[in-house]
Amino acid sequence: MVLFIRQLSGHQGKDTLGRRACGGNAEYPLMDTLTYEISSTAARLVVDEGLEYGPAKRRALKSLGLPARTPLPDNEAVEEAVREHIALFCADTQPGELAALRRLALVWMERLEGFRPHLGGAVWQGTATRLSDIHIQLFCDDPKSAEIALINQQVDYEVRAVNGFNGETVDALSLHARCPELGESVGVHLLVYDHDDLRGALKPDRRGRKPRGDLGAVRALLAEA
C-alpha cells in the first residue's frame, strides 16, 4: 500500500479539517494527514473531472492505494479541499464559469417557477466549474406535474431514482441544456419533492449556511457578482 503523505510544517495545534472528518469533538495536535490526502485527491477529481463527492472519495482511495474500508472524509472536508484547489489552480476561470452556470440555472428556475424551484449543490454553494452539473429541487403539489410541464415544453429528459436530502428516494428529471456562455451543454437535474418537504429544505447546515436558495436568492447572488 502506497501512501502519499505531505510534510505539514506549521500545522500544529487545532485543525478543523482533520477534526471534522473524524466526526468527533476531540482536538488533534496535528492534522490527520491521511484524511487530508483523501480530501485533496477527491477535490482534484471533483474540480478537474466533474465527479460528485461520493464517487470522487471512493476513487481517491484507489488512487492512493488505500483499502476500500478506509474511513472517508465527510463532504464538508472535501468541500473545503475543493475551495482550496479552486483558489490555487482555477482562480482566474472559475468565477466566470460559476456565474454562467448560475445564469443558466436561473433560466430553468424561471421556466419552472410554478414548482417552487430551489437551487442546490455546487452551483449554489459557489464551488462549481464548467464541468459541474446544475441541481434544482422542485417542490410540487403533484409529483407528476413537473414531468407534464417538461413534456408540454417539448423538453427531452430521463427519469432516475436518487437519494433525496432526507435520505428518501426521489425522482430526478435529468436533461441537457445548452449554455451559450460556456459554449457547451450542461447537465441539469430536477429533483422532484412533495410540497410539504419544503419545510425542512431550508434548515441551515452545521456552518449556518442555507443548503439551497429560491429564485430571489439566486438573483441576489448574480447581482452581487
Segments from the language model and where they lie:
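Short, solvent-exposed linear motifs at loop/edge-of-secondary-structure regions
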Residues: 17-18, 140
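Short hydrophobic/aromatic beta-strand micro-patches
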Residues: 135-141
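Cationic, low-complexity basic patches in intrinsically disordered or flexible, solvent-exposed regions
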Residues: 8
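Short hydrophobic transmembrane-like helices used for membrane targeting/insertion
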Residues: 1-5
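Catalytic core of pol beta-like nucleotidyltransferases
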Residues: 32-50, 57-130, 141-225
